[in-house]
A protein has these predicted regions:
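C-terminal accessory module of base-excision DNA glycosylases/AP lyases that mediates lesion recognition
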Residues: 1-37, 125, 139-217
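Alpha-helical ds-nucleic-acid-binding substructure associated with the helix-hairpin-helix region
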Residues: 7, 26, 30, 58-135, ...
Length: 217
């Protein structure tokens, strides 16, 4: 099996971006507007995945605010601390669906039913299959976890609305591409799709002056 490409530091990101621009010269203009790309790596494990779950379908500002309240209430972002909150977590800004998802995740980690570190060393498809068997964790959440907690270089979360908007805008498409079309477009950028995603999130932020990437810098 070929070694998986990983983004572990800013040098990896810079090297990958250079290769990406060679693959698709259309991206040069987007890169100029986007400016420097943040690495955005975050710690793997329950804390990293829990933050991504909190970030589902809300603005970055809202996700950050909810997460701060959760961390204050938990004291430490660990499965046992989350489970100890019980339904009090609902008063901190979580929907019932997200609370159920986080509770299920915490229970699975505590029981040893899933190893959130080991799956990062598996092929992307295997990691996604392991994560999506848990209640409330879908493709977007799995892909974002593999990208930003595992450094996988060839993942593109086409379900991300801001990312699709940025692709449509940056490539001057007549309409915003849907998930299927965005996935097809992103095939051009293999094996650097996670770098392309970072590029388009940075482009979105530069154009709209609003952060949309699912994890902080």
């Amino acid at each position: 099996m070929a070694e998986m490409m990983r983004i572990r530091n800013q040098a990896d990101l810079a090297t990958g971006l250079e290769a990406l621009l060679d693959i698709d010269p259309r991206l040069h203009a987007i890169a100029r507007q986007a400016g420097p790309l943040p690495l955005r790596l975050t710690e793997p494990g329950f804390e990293g995945l829990a933050f991504i779950i909190v970030s589902q379908m809300v603005s970055r500002a809202s996700a950050d605010a909810i997460w701060r309240r959760l961390c204050e209430a938990m004291g430490t972002a660990e499965p046992a601390a989350y489970l100890a909150l019980g339904d009090a977590a609902l008063s901190l800004g979580l929907s019932r669906a997200k609370h159920a998802c986080l509770s299920g995740l915490a229970s699975a980690v505590q029981a040893g039913d899933i190893d959130l570190f080991a799956i990062l060393d598996q092929p992307v498809e295997t990691g996604i299959a392991e994560l999506t068997r848990l209640r409330g964790i879908g493709l977007w959440t799995s892909e974002v976890y593999l990208m930003f907690c595992g450094g996988h270089a060839d993942v593109f979360p086409a379900g991300d609305v801001a990312l699709r908007a940025a692709v449509g805008d940056g490539l001057c498409l007549a309409t915003r591409p849907d998930i299927r079309e965005t996935t097809r477009i992103a095939l051009t950028w293999r094996p650097y799709r996670a770098i392309a995603a970072r590029l388009f999130w940075a482009f979105y932020a530069a154009r709209l002056r609003r952060e949309a990437a699912p994890v902080p810098v």
